[in-house]
UniProtKB/Swiss-Prot annotation:
PROSITE patterns: RIBONUCLEASE_II. It catalyses: Exonucleolytic cleavage in the 3'- to 5'-direction to yield nucleoside 5'-phosphates. Involved in mRNA degradation. Hydrolyzes single-stranded polyribonucleotides processively in the 3' to 5' direction. Residues 561-643 form the S1 motif domain. GO terms for molecular function: exoribonuclease II activity; RNA binding. GO terms for cellular component: cytosol. NCBIfam families: 3_prime_RNase, PRK05054.1, RNase_B. It is found in: Cytoplasm. The keyword Nuclease applies. Its EC number is 3.1.13.1. GO terms for biological process: mRNA catabolic process. It comes from Enterobacter sp. (strain 638). This is Exoribonuclease 2. The keyword Hydrolase applies.
């Protein structure tokens, strides 16, 4: 009788509209309760029974109840689920399947079944890709998922790689396809096979995409020719291979192996600038003045070359530093190395004065056994040979940026605008507290940004530099020429790695059109969106595999007295993140490990410091000694504590 009563319906509606509600993101804890985080300042407690309706990371609206001055949230409507497609570990009990998502804050098993299109017979411990199908806030009784893909068995030694690639939905192997013959591009190729081109790479590199040759003019100026592998001589625009490269966008470099953008036959053989093999190239010749300036007579052209030597970074560096037994196999190669060093030093000086030079950080290389076990992690400092290649590539990319801008007005550019305009007042205020004075408008110009960077680089520590990082904008990929503040350059367009970057292949096609005097269409903006997204995913995959391998490598150090020097890289309310100097692993030091009395401890992300009883004890960029307290394999996290 009452159910159709309009007055009752109206009353219900009124009550509903008067009940306070909030929208936010669910944050789970390990103790069963959770919080609805509305913004940085406001959060509501979610009791354990209500947490059963939601999952960590869900965006929901909730009814806010007030009892005895305590506010609690009752999740009511799902706005955006945290889990849609995910990876996890399968459990099997009495022929019933469930899956535990591979996420540090998701511990509960979700009932599931194998999807119709997935024919694998799932066993306990298998890794799988799953798709959420049911959610309590959608009116379902509980959570439920379908297993859509089998990833691998629990005892596979390469679980870190396969699970990570599946998580980010990235390819596991090289693309299929062959290129049987070179295209007729109507390009005249200069025969440079007699010149002493050399490649300098890691000893294990197979996909050599750059070769260098220098000669000195009578006036003492250096003429550098950068020859770059030419995959677009084999791959037609719009072909199957081109489409697959466009999707992959980059070769994916993971610890231990890579997944190439192009078929290996091309990347490691036909296009690779192997020694004593004749190869087609796209080349750039530039004149470098005594002070390192690149003069205006930049020339791009097609050619064939024959690399005369595959040199390794360490050998070249040792020889130039007068160490080790290696020496160049001929006087001609020795002369090339010496001239390349001159190019490097003069260009490095020019960039220091007129642009910006990144601080050298070592690369960390995982040494793996046949079963994926980590035998060692080696810090490889950037030495003179690395800098020779880096300076040559940066010079070549500056040339491409200029030529594309002046001849076409477009290309694939790396653009970085420095600071976000919305942040410059706060930036100036922060710097002022450290006696560094900047004009909020001036730092938005390339010149003003470079001036500030040089001032920060001259500081005794990197502390202030680390404080202003949060005000910086991100680098972008754009079809429009624009400045790259991070490098201190007016424009920057890469073309020197076309075997491993699709954007460089696009720039090759544009440069070839200029060489031939033809018109060509501007690249589509969607292509740059795909490149940026793939770059992000590849970086996350590299980090995820690295975290897994670091956890494996350091697990036997947990609870021991082994000391590691560690640089503080971040401070938050909960503690500090540090990077171990000798191997690059990132570890977390919880606040209770810093000081036992919580009220006497202030961990400030804002100030980048930890204070105990009002005294600053730690700050970002400090290097401290730590022990490994614990390694949690299921979350691949390393917990450290300071050595007292």
């Amino acid at each position: 009788m009452l159910q159709d009563n309009p007055l009752l319906a109206q009353l219900k509606q009124q009550l509903h509209s008067q009940t306070p509600r909030a929208e936010g993101v669910v944050k789970a804890t390990e103790k069963g309760f959770g919080f609805l985080e509305v913004d940085a300042q406001k959060s509501y407690f979610i009791p354990p029974p209500q947490m059963k309706k939601v999952m960590h990371g869900d965006r929901v609206t909730a009814v806010i109840h007030t009892q005895k001055d305590r506010e609690t949230a009752e999740p009511e409507e799902l706005i955006e689920p945290f889990l849609t497609r995910f990876v996890g570990k399968v459990h099997k009990k009495d022929d019933r399947l469930s899956i535990v998502p591979d996420h540090p804050l998701l511990k509960d098993a979700i009932p599931c079944r194998a999807d119709r299109n997935c024919e694998h017979d799932f066993k306990e411990g298998d890794w799988a890709v799953a798709q959420m199908r049911r959610h309590p806030l959608k009116g379902d009784r509980g959570f439920y998922a379908d297993l859509t893909h089998f990833i691998t068995y629990s005892d596979d030694h390469f679980v870190p790689w396969w699970v990570t690639l599946a998580r980010h939905n990235l390819e596991k192997e090289a693309p299929n396809g062959v290129a049987t013959e070179m295209l007729d591009e109507g390009l005249e190729r200069r025969d440079l096979t007699a010149l002493n081109f050399v490649t300098i790479d890691s000893a294990s590199t197979q996909d050599m995409d750059d070769a260098l040759y220098v000669e000195e003019g009578a006036d003492g100026k250096l003429h550098l020719t950068v020859a770059i592998a030419d995959p677009t001589a084999w791959i037609a625009e719009g072909s199957k291979l081109d489409d697959s490269a466009k999707v992959r966008a980059f070769t994916n470099y993971l610890p231990g192996f890579n997944i190439p953008m192009l078929p290996r036959e091309l990347s490691d053989d036909l296009c690779s600038l192997r020694p004593n093999q004749i190869r087609p190239v796209l080349a750039c010749r530039m004149t470098i003045a005594a002070d390192g300036t690149i003069e205006d007579d930049i020339e791009f052209f097609a050619a064939t070359i024959e690399s005369k030597a595959k040199l390794a970074y360490d050998d070249v560096s040792n020889w130039l530093e007068g160490a080790g037994n290696w020496k160049p196999e001929s006087e001609a190669i020795a002369q090339q190395i010496t001239l390349l060093q001159r190019v490097c030093l003069s260009r490095g000086e020019w960039r220091k004065t007129h642009a910006l030079v990144f601080k050298d950080r070592p690369d960390y290389r995982f040494v793996l056994g046949e079963k994926g076990e980590v035998l060692d992690i080696v810090a490889e400092p950037r030495r003179i040979a690395n800098r020779i290649v880096e300076e040559s590539m940066i010079a070549a990319n500056i040339c491409a940026a200029r030529v594309l801008r002046d001849k076409l007005g477009f290309g694939i550019y790396n653009v970085h605008t420095g600071f976000d305009p919305a942040n410059t007042e706060a930036l100036a205020a922060l710097l002022k507290t450290h006696d560094v004075h900047v004009d909020p408008q001036e730092v938005l110009t390339l010149e003003g940004f470079c001036k500030l960077r040089r001032e920060l680089d001259a500081q005794p520590s990197g502390f202030l530099d680390s404080r202003i990082r949060r005000f910086q904008s991100y680098a972008e990929i754009s079809t429009e020429p624009g400045p790259h503040f991070g490098l201190g350059l007016e424009a920057y367009a890469t073309w020197t790695s076309p075997i491993r970057k699709y954007g460089d292949m696009v720039n090759h096609r544009l440069l070839k059109a200029i060489v031939k005097g033809e018109t060509i269409a501007r690249p589509q903006d969607e292509a740059t969106v795909q490149m940026a997204e793939r770059r992000r995913l590849n970086r996350m995959a590299e980090r995820d595999v690295g975290d897994w391998l670091y956890a494996r490598f350091l697990s036997d150090k947990a609870g021991t007295d082994t000391r590691f020097a560690a640089e503080i890289i971040d401070i938050s309310r909960g503690g500090m993140r540090v990077r171990l100097v000798e191997n690059g692993a990132v570890a977390f030091i919880p606040a209770p490990f810093l000081h036992a009395v919580r009220d006497e401890l202030v961990c400030s992300q804002e100030n980048g410091s930890v204070q105990i009883k009002g005294e600053t004890v730690y700050k970002v960029t400090d290097v401290i000694d730590v022990n490994i307290a614990e390694v949690r394999m299921e979350t691949r996290s390393i917990i450290a504590r300071p050595v007292v």
